[in-house]
Amino acid sequence: NINKNTNTNFIPLIILFIIILSIELLTLDFSKFSQNIDYVHDGMLLTPSSNAYFLNKFWESSYIERGLFAQFSPLALWNLFDIKSIGLIHINNLILLYLNKILLVIFCSKIAQHLSSNEFIKKIYFIILSVLSVSLVSYYNLSAFPERSFLFLLFFIIFTNLFSYTKFYFSSFILGLFSVISMLWFIDIGAYINFLLLIILSYFLITKEFKKFSSILFGIILGWGLFITLIPQSEFTEFINITLSIYTNVDYYNGLIYPTPFLSGDARSTRALLLIIFAGILTILIIFNKNMKLSYENRILFIFLFIASILMFKTALSRSDTPHIKVAVGFNLFLIYAASLYILFYFFEKNEKINLQINKFLILFKKKYFNIIVIFFLLNIFILKENIIDLKNFPHSFNNIK
C-alpha cells in the first residue's frame, strides 16, 4: 500500500488550518496588547524609527543593534497607515506570529510529503505535527517561534524545494538572496542563515551539484550587489561598522552566564540542554537506521534542522535568562516533534494490531467532515484553549484593531 512516488495534496488541509488560525487571530482581545508599554523593547523600536522619520537616514541616525526591519518596522507602518502610533508595533508583532503559524503548517506539509507512507498516513502525520508545531506560537506569552523566526521558517520552506529537479533552479537563486535579506531582517538571524548558506554551498560543492551551487552563489552576489548599489556609501559603511560592533561586543554588554546544568537549580536551562541532546539522538537514530526508510529529502532536512537548532541556541547563550532560553528552543522542539512522530508511526506500521486499528480510523478519515472535526478538536485543545472564551470578539475584531 505504500507508494513513495505519490504526491499528496495537502492544499485543502492547509487552507482549513489557515481559516481556523485566522478565526483565532480575530478572536483575540486586542485591548490586552495596548494596555502596557515595554519602555526598553518598545523604545528600541520607537527611537530609531523616530530618528529616521525626521532625519531620513537609517544606520547614520541610530545605533541599529537588532536589524533594519527589526528596528524600523514602526516607520514603515507609520507611513503605510499615515499615523504615528505605539499600538502599530503590537499589530506588527501579532501579524508576524500569525504568519509564523501558517509557515509552520506549510513546513509540516513539506516534511509529510516526503514520508515513505501512503496518503492517509501522511495526512495524519501532517495534522498532528501541525497542531503540535502551531502550539509553540503564542500571542499572549513568549513564543518558542517569536516574530524574528518568520524569515528563518521561510528560508527552510524554500530550502525544501532545492531537492526538486527543475531546469532553472529558481529556489536555489532565491535562497541565495536570503544572505542579504536576512542581514536586513535581524542581524542574529542573518548570521545564522549565512552560516547555513555556507554549509549548503559546501554540501553542493562536495556532491558536485554545480548548478545549484552556482544558482545560490549568484543569488548571494546579486543580492549584496543591489544592496550596495542602492544605498548611500555612508549608510553602507555605518551598516558594516555597527554590525561588526554588535557581533564583537554583544556577549559583553548583553551577556548573562548560562546556569550550570543540574547544579544551578534552574530547571529550564538544564532542560534546554537536554532537549538539544535528545534532538541529536533522535536525528542520528532516524538517519542511520535503514529500516526506517527515511527519504533523502527528509534526511538532509533533519540534519540542517538540527544545525539550525544549535545556531538558534546562541540566543540563549548570549543572554541566559528564562525568556531568551525559551525563544531559543523552537527549532529544537519542532525537530523533536517531527522525529518522534516519525519513529512512532514507524512502530505503529510494524505492529499488526495497532495497524489494524489505524486502518479503521483511516476509513473515517476519508470522510471530509471527519477531517474538520479532528482538526478543530485538536486545535481547541492545544491552541485555542486560551482564546476560545473570546469568540465574542470575532464580530467586532476589525473595530477592536482600530
Language model features by range: what are they?
Residues 151-153, 191-192, 320-354, 393:
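Hydrophobic/aromatic-rich transmembrane helices and adjacent perimembrane loops
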Residues 23-71, 76-99, 135-148, 187-195, ...:
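Transmembrane catalytic cores of multi-pass membrane glycosyltransferases
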Residues 94-117:
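Transmembrane-helix motifs of polytopic, lipid-linked glycan transferases
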